[in-house]
Amino acid sequence: MAVRIEVLKEDNRTRARLGKLHTPHGVIETPVFMPVGTQATVKTMTPEELKDLGAGIILSNTYHLFLRPGHELIREAGGLHAFMHWDGAILTDSGGFQVFSLGDLRKITEEGVEFRSHLDGSKKFLSPEIATQVQMALGSDIVMAFDECTPYPATRDYAKASLERTTRWLKRCQETLTTTDRQALFGIVQGSMYEDLRKQSAAEITELDLPGYAVGGLSVGEPKELMYEVLDYTVPLLPKDKPRYLMGVGSPDALIEGVMRGIDMFDCVLPTRIARNGTALTRYGKLVVRNAESAHDFSPIDPTCDCYTCKNYSRAYLRHLIKADEILGLRLMTIHNLRFLTNLMSEIRAAIKENRLPEYREKFFYEYGYLK
């Protein structure tokens, strides 16, 4: 099996797990946050910087790479790892979420999805087979199944038809993937916010005995309380001996809550996207560095942070860079936000190990401002 999880400890007061994710490109401590490198790059970061920040696995995007530069070119380069000079693990999402976000620009059939490229308006087609073949060409360690990402809100009938199609498509992905010695296919549980539909979806996809499972269709606009409720009844339906991945979640509160419900893996564009907007994550909540109050503040973003940015630069200097549209500003903010989250995950793992996760959550939430 190309990818497996070794569960080292289960928390006795929550559903949290401490583990090691074994992949063809290294062993990653879990729970883990995966930075997003949509177009074969985590925006503004070099692979060496990502390693220094503590990232062992990153996410890349099938939809974007399929459109540009094209998967055949990446195959020619020796795969995504060689192409982008990254020797850690890579998870590629299937492109399903991006295609379904196109709204009126796409047409869903049983065969797949016809859509217009956001780059040049040309007609394209993605199916379970094509999405899997593209990911085989990319050579990622973890291949996500091509699923129908159900929007929120969705009617019960739509959610049921959608999850059943996702199961049929998953079987087609499984039949297409011939590189199981070095690539692991993860199935995705759908079912919107309906408990019985989530149960149906989980039962159907776990029957296929895949190397890992993801919870999809969350973090799509629903209230966080509802997302936690769905996780409460969905995660226990997934096998304990397989990795569990919550797609598209990366805010500090949701990472902690997700871990407490038994999730091992997370990804989100949040830290990199808000960095480019001039917003930093800190222990005491979000800090909008571009705001006027940072103009004469010569302290670091977060004095407790060990990242390159906090060790060397002031809020005033960072604000100047951001206001002047200097690229260094985006880089330094991104370095900090990614380090903040890899550090958060490291603290979460330590808290699980030392049986103090609920206490850690309470202290973190209080300091961050979630409880005020």
Curated annotation (Swiss-Prot):
Positions of the catalytic residues: 93 (proton acceptor), 267 (nucleophile)
Enzyme Commission identifier(s): 2.4.2.29
InterPro entries tied to this protein: ArchSynthase1/Queuine_TRR, TGT, TGT-like_sf, tRNA_ribo_trans-like
Pfam family, one: TGT
Chain segments carrying region RNA binding: 248-254, 272-276
The entry's keywords: Glycosyltransferase, Metal-binding, Queuosine biosynthesis, Transferase, tRNA processing, Zinc
Gene3D superfamilies on file: Queuine tRNA-ribosyltransferase-like (3.20.20.105)
Binding site for substrate: 93-97, 147, 190, 217
Cofactor note: Binds 1 zinc ion per subunit.
Chain residues that bind Zn(2+): 305, 307, 310, 336
GO molecular function, one term: metal ion binding
Catalysis: reaction(s): 7-aminomethyl-7-carbaguanine + guanosine(34) in tRNA = 7-aminomethyl-7-carbaguanosine(34) in tRNA + guanine
Gene Ontology biological process: queuosine biosynthetic process; tRNA wobble guanine modification; tRNA-guanine transglycosylation
Pathway(s) where this gene product acts: tRNA modification; tRNA-queuosine biosynthesis
Required cofactor names: Zn(2+)
Enzymatic class: transferase
Protein family: Belongs to the queuine tRNA-ribosyltransferase family.
Quaternary state and interactors: Homodimer. Within each dimer, one monomer is responsible for RNA recognition and catalysis, while the other monomer binds to the replacement base PreQ1.
Biological function: Catalyzes the base-exchange of a guanine (G) residue with the queuine precursor 7-aminomethyl-7-deazaguanine (PreQ1) at position 34 (anticodon wobble position) in tRNAs with GU(N) anticodons (tRNA-Asp, -Asn, -His and -Tyr). Catalysis occurs through a double-displacement mechanism. The nucleophile active site attacks the C1' of nucleotide 34 to detach the guanine base from the RNA, forming a covalent enzyme-RNA intermediate. The proton acceptor active site deprotonates the incoming PreQ1, allowing a nucleophilic attack on the C1' of the ribose to form the product.
Protein name from the UniProt record: Queuine tRNA-ribosyltransferase
Origin species: Desulfitobacterium hafniense (strain DSM 10664 / DCB-2)
Gene name of the record: tgt
